[in-house]
């Protein structure tokens, strides 16, 4: 029997992350569809890192002991990756960045790398994930590369034909298969992304976001369906979960406190020895409402510490807010940040706050001027001066994803950020990010439960698994990966926290 292969080239979207150690919804969806469509077949999970390793002759791109981001996320199938592609009856490629992303330990598969990998494949080839939007928008560029394209989901019934609409959640539930065989092929400890719903609950959509284009109508999953999937993953050995892959956790079932309590409590009950339970994405309009404070308290009560509720102000500039239908004003954001701080700023047993806000800023949106950056600096300074805490800040350039109003504008006159983005980002790093890190993770803070996960020129990076988890750099050290221990914070720099080991590690 020929194998069937999932080729994971990693995905990044505003609503979800599919870069290891995150186990994406796309990968699990493809796994279940292939298991149902070919129950007798050997389903193999391969990453683009496996392919890179083979094509490079089994050699890393850096000198040991440094970690190689191009082959870091290799699976147990690393040495056989090319042969598996050659022998496979079916290859499902999962790929696409809907937003720009940079990862210390990973490099998403490029179009050229995907084409090179598929040149080895003799069977049928299918695409699933955000890259499908580009494949449908510019078909000539992708001609001959894929036999069919799936934009949202894939099922055993439509696998061979392609699909441009998502399968309903009932069908997805019926098709869901055991994940044990999938998880066993991952040499890392995965954190599973759990989707709660599709679409955006706002009445007006942000012009840059791909979610309304991807899912124009809102569709919520039932609480028991989500809990059952978490239990299946738990049975497969997964102990880390993030309730992500939706635009706003707080808006689940239209901000239904009882449903959210049942969801979090159900996962805790069915996964009693979980290590991480975090959330992702929070609409500041929902968080700023009175019910937002109550939901934030539920998150702080049921989830594990070090949790983050990322919120998109996107811009503090009133002109940019109006031009791009952003709806969130600085006043609304401040109230939302206050609510999350009130609910979650208390520290857990491991030394980290239970729940803090994260902030998202986007440059390169229509209406931007040099004054936009000044407004952003003033807005951030106001939060800092108020004594509030923030877990992390993501500053990026806008990307025009196919199907969004931003993409419909076509080529724009270059905005100031085209020239000044790196300089402006450095301003935020020095005046906001570093002072906030010093406040949230002060010198002398002891952080247990860390593991070494990356060795670079500057030293060894330590982290916990979680939503935008804390990372501490032990300078001038090359600690074997997977070592566990505690570090004490010794210093800070923009985007960095430094520390030293204070306990025996194993």
Model-derived regions, located:
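Canonical Radical SAM [4Fe-4S] cluster-binding loop centered on the CxxxCxxC motif
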Residues: 186-225
């Amino acid at each position: 029997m020929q194998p069937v292969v999932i080729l994971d080239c990693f995905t990044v979207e505003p609503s979800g992350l599919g870069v290891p150690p995150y186990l994406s919804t796309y990968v699990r969806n493809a796994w279940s569809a292939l298991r149902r469509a070919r129950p007798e077949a050997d389903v193999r999970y391969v990453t683009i890192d496996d392919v890179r390793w083979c094509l490079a002759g089994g050699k890393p791109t850096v000198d040991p002991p440094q970690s190689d981001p191009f082959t870091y996320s290799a699976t147990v199938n690393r040495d056989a990756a090319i042969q598996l592609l050659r022998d496979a009856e079916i290859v499902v490629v999962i790929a696409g960045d809907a937003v720009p992303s940079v990862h210390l330990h990973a490099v998403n598969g490029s179009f050229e790398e995907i084409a090179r990998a598929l040149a080895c494949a003799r069977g049928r080839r299918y695409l699933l994930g955000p890259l499908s939007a580009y494949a449908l928008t510019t078909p000539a560029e992708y001609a001959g590369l894929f036999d069919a394209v799936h934009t949202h989901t894939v099922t055993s019934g439509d696998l061979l034909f392609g699909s441009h609409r998502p399968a309903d959640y009932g069908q997805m539930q019926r098709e869901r298969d055991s994940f044990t065989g999938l998880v066993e092929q991952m040499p890392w400890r995965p954190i599973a992304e759990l989707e709660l719903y599709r679409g955006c609950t706002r009445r007006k959509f942000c012009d840059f976001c791909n979610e309304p284009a991807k899912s124009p109508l809102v569709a919520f999953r039932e609480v028991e369906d989500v809990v059952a999937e978490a239990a299946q993953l738990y049975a497969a050995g997964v102990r880390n979960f993030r309730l992500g892959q939706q635009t706003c956790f707080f808006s689940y079932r239209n901000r239904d406190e009882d449903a959210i309590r049942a969801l979090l409590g159900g996962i805790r009950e069915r996964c009693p020895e979980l290590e991480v339970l975090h959330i992702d994405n929070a609409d500041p309009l929902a968080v700023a409402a009175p019910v937002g404070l109550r939901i934030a308290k539920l998150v702080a009560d049921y989830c594990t510490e070090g949790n983050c509720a990322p919120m998109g102000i996107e811009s503090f500039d009133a002109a940019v807010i109006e031009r791009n239908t952003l709806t969130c004003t600085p006043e609304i954001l401040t109230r939302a940040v206050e609510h999350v701080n009130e609910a979650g700023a208390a520290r857990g047993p491991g030394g980290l706050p239970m729940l803090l806000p994260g902030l998202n800023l986007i440059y390169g949106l229509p209406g931007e001027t040099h004054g936009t950056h000044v407004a952003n600096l003033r807005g951030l300074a106001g939060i800092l001066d108020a004594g509030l805490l923030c877990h992390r800040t993501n500053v990026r350039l806008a990307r025009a994803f196919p199907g969004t109003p931003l993409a419909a504008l076509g080529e724009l006159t270059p905005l100031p950020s085209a020239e000044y983005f790196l300089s402006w980002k450095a301003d935020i790093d020095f005046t906001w990010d570093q002072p906030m890190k010093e406040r949230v993770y002060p010198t002398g803070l002891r952080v247990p439960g860390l593991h070494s996960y990356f060795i670079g020129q500057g030293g060894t990076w330590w982290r916990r698994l979680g939503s935008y988890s804390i990372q501490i750099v032990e300078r001038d050290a090359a600690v074997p990966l997977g070592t566990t221990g505690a570090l004490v914070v010794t210093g800070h720099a923009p985007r960095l926290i430094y520390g030293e080991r204070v306990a025996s590690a194993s």
